[in-house]
Amino acid sequence: MALMEVNFFSKALMRPVTMNVILPVDKVFFGEETEEENKPFKTLYLLHGVMGNYTDWVTGTCIKRWAEEKNLAVVMPSGANMFYMDHTNANENYSEFIGKELVKITRRMFPLSHKKEDTFIAGLSMGGYGAIRNGLKYHDTFGYIAGLSSAMILEKMRTADDSSPMFFEKKSFLENVFGDLSRIKDCEINPEWIAENMKKDGIPFPHMYLACGLDDPLLPPNRKFRDTMQKLGVDVTYEEGPGAHEWDFWNRYIKRVLDWLPLDKDSKEGMNSGNVGL
């Protein structure tokens, strides 16, 4: 299993950026050959939450081991605290970066499948919002979307003020990220608005997986979002389970995301120090 830290210049962000990439290219199979080596990899673009970066998923979960077991490439970029939105005036176009540039450049760098049905996007909290919104916005690219404890907070944002001790709940911060909070319901900032317009235009929806912990304060808005997606006809798999807004929950449920994705059921785990028997 190759784990790479990759630096490159992003035209969408107009600066160098760093990402982690998991690529199961070096599996060891004693005494046999496998055709897995010649197939382009199905790919998961995996987004972190507020105050995180490209290292979060590798340090907080077992994604590296599970990606090897599933023969899955995983790309983990940094999104700052910008909710994976475009900010054209500041050359901080994170939506374009995630939905277009990152996919294009990783497909040039690595043996990744170019098929929509093999290209997935997921994230937690802020990254869950970013995965859902950009997965719908770039529906020609992503066939599957997954959000864990997703920050579906647009309704709450409309009544925000600056009294919260949490910087990401302050009105001033939210206005800097999302702009005029009075207009967010009826524009592409709102994933529900994107989905409604896709339905009007007869555009097929990506498959969607949503999960949230029973002790997570984001549970009510995630339930509401699930209901809206189901009413629109989105193929939604929804789960709740013990846990709060924490890595213990995300570690368990990112495994469930991988089990839900259309990955190779007959993929074999290579020999490694954890299973070699010595």
Model regions and ranges:
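Non-catalytic cap/lid and distal C-terminal segments of serine-dependent acyl enzymes
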Residues: M1-L278
